[in-house]
Amino acid sequence: MNLNRYVIAGGLSLAFHALLLITTDEAQVFAMPAGNPTQSVSINMVSMPKVAPAQPEQTQTEQSKPESVKPTPVQEVVKTPPAKPKVKPHKPKPQTVKKPVPAEQVPSKSVAKPQPEKVERTAETAQKPAPTPNQQPSQPTAASQGITSQPILVDKPALVSAQVQPRYPRIARKRGIEGTVMYEIWLDAQGNQIKQQLLSSSGTEALDQSALEAIKQWKFSPHILDGVPVAHRIHIPIRFKLEG
């Protein structure tokens, strides 16, 4: 009876230890493969030597993983080539700007030389006509003075005949237009009219024209100065006014 107990107890202990060994093997098997529980169970049921080929699978997976990490340096290579294109700076431009500066100095010298020549020539021409009036005898007549230079102004001209009264324009009468016009008349030594100049207008062209037509018909006697008739000029104001 005691032997049977020992045998049974020894068998139980062996079975218990066998189970422990199996469970430890199962724990190792579950740690090795990643995500394949069905395969690990079938391997444990057959035999232990099949656990060894599971290790190269891990090495293969470990070797395959770093291969996926390698493409990162490729991005760094892409950044470098388009970064610094040297197209914008053009060095020949400042050279073209500096060249014309000395060219401007050259014509300035050539221009400066002919200037005194022109001045000398003009001075010579100006000096040449100077002796001509000295050579000619002074023969100024009263008539020539009235044409070339401004004659003297006479306040009270002498009329030969009665003045012709200017005509009052009909349009100005109907509209009630009034005004005063003044003309300057140039006369030669004989008293003949040379020039008529409007000094101040009446504000209406019709009145100014009517006064001018009347003045042109006036005749003046010569103005005598120191016993010599001279050219002169006079101012004639004409006033247009409606009565009543």
From Swiss-Prot:
Residues 133-146 have a biased composition (Polar residues). GO terms for molecular function: energy transducer activity. One of its GO terms (biological process) is transmembrane transport. The chain crosses the membrane at residues 7-23. GO terms for cellular component: outer membrane-bounded periplasmic space; plasma membrane protein complex. Residues 1-6 are cytoplasmic. It comes from the Bacteria. Residues 51-146 are annotated as: Disordered. Pfam families: TonB_C (PF03544). The keyword Cell membrane applies. Keywords: Cell inner membrane, Cell membrane, Membrane, Protein transport, Signal-anchor, Transmembrane, Transmembrane helix, Transport. It is a single-pass membrane protein. The keyword Acyltransferase does not apply. Residues 153-244 form the TonB C-terminal domain. Residues 24-244 are periplasmic. It is found in: Cell inner membrane. Interacts with outer membrane receptor proteins that carry out high-affinity binding and energy dependent uptake into the periplasmic space of specific substrates. It could act to transduce energy from the cytoplasmic membrane to specific energy-requiring processes in the outer membrane, resulting in the release into the periplasm of ligands bound by these outer membrane proteins. Homodimer. Forms a complex with the accessory proteins ExbB and ExbD. Belongs to the TonB family. PANTHER family: PROTEIN TONB, PROTEIN TONB-RELATED. This is Protein TonB. It comes from Vibrio cholerae serotype O1 (strain ATCC 39315 / El Tor Inaba N16961). The gene is tonB.
